[in-house]
Design a protein with these regions (language model features):
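N-terminal lobe of the biotin/lipoate ligase/transferase fold
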Residues: 1-92, 111-113, 120, 163, ...
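Residue-level signal for inorganic ion chemistry
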Residues: 17, 43, 61, 85, ...
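Beta-strand scaffold of nucleotide-dependent catalytic cores
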Residues: 36, 114-116, 130-131, 141
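Acidic (Asp/Glu) carboxylate-rich active-site/surface patches
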Residues: 87-124, 134
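Conserved, helical-rich catalytic subdomain that frames metal- and/or nucleotide-binding sites
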Residues: 158-211, 247
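Conserved RNA-binding domains used in RNP assembly and mRNA/RNA metabolism
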Residues: 201-248
Length: 248
């Protein structure tokens, strides 16, 4: 079974842990290299969005993996990571985060964590994957930019719990090590865990598409972590990328 050998690199501040680790990866850094920053000045999320990363209030970290697999496996790695991070948060805090497909973690209706997987490919194989995790731990509502206050939260803002960031980092790395070993053997290893936390299943969602947005019923998650939806016309579609919003 594959085991990660963690090599930790800690910084007071970086522009982005993912950006920094991608540079190390391109220079030949070994699998298991981790970059952690106390703050990010240009934290990034999916689809080019910024990620607010205030000084000392969250966990901002990236992990380098070099799996022997097809490039198409990147989405399953991201989804398995989301499930593993949920498990780590629950272990330390006792609260159970939910997953919004594909990789956003929510607690009591607000986003507390984002996961960004960026990869390099050689032919049809993954050369490396950098998994970035941005987790809001003790961030207060007033610490977020005003435009994010209605959607963003933290473990503290949603529960009143003050959790030591070091304990969360340790738990996350432990869970990621177990997840990666399982994922290398079975790309859908955490599928059931993922589905149990994907509370949008059975609800109406809006699929945001270049061809026009549409409403659909979220029905299932496939073994490769596609989202199965049923349109109002009764057509079943499987989404492997894109953006959705959940109807309240």
């Amino acid at each position: 079974m594959k085991r990660l050998q963690i090599k930790l690199n800690a910084f007071e501040s970086l522009d982005s842990t993912n950006t920094y680790l991608k540079k190390l990866a391109a220079e030949g850094a070994s699998e298991g290299t981790v970059v952690i920053a106390n703050a990010q000045t240009a934290g990034r999320g999916r689809m080019g969005r910024s990620f607010a990363s205030a000084q000392g209030l969250g966990v901002y970290m990236s992990l380098l993996l070099r799996p022997d697999c097809a490039a198409s496996c990147a989405q399953s790695l991201t989804a398995n990571t989301a499930a593993a991070v949920c498990m780590a948060i629950e272990t330390v805090s006792g609260v159970k985060p939910e997953i919004k497909w594909v990789n956003d973690l929510y607690l009591k209706g607000k986003k507390i964590c984002g996961i960004l997987c960026e990869s390099a490919v050689s032919g049809d194989k993954l050369d490396y994957a950098v998994i970035g995790i941005g987790l809001n731990v003790i961030t207060r509502p007033e610490d977020f930019p005003e435009e994010l206050r209605h959607t963003a939260g933290s473990i503290y803002s949603q529960t009143g719990l003050i959790i030591e960031r070091g304990k969360l980092i340790s738990a996350i790395l432990t869970e990621l090590g177990g997840m990666y070993a399982a994922w290398c053997e079975d790309k859908s290893a955490y599928l059931n865990e993922y589905k149990s936390r994907c509370t949008m299943l059975g609800r109406v969602v809006t699929v945001i598409s270049p061809d026009g947005d549409y409403d659909a019923l979220a029905k299932d998650i496939t073994p490769d972590f596609g989202l199965v939806v049923e349109t109002v016309d009764g057509e079943t579609r499987t989404l492997h990328s894109g953006e959705i919003s959940v109807k309240i």
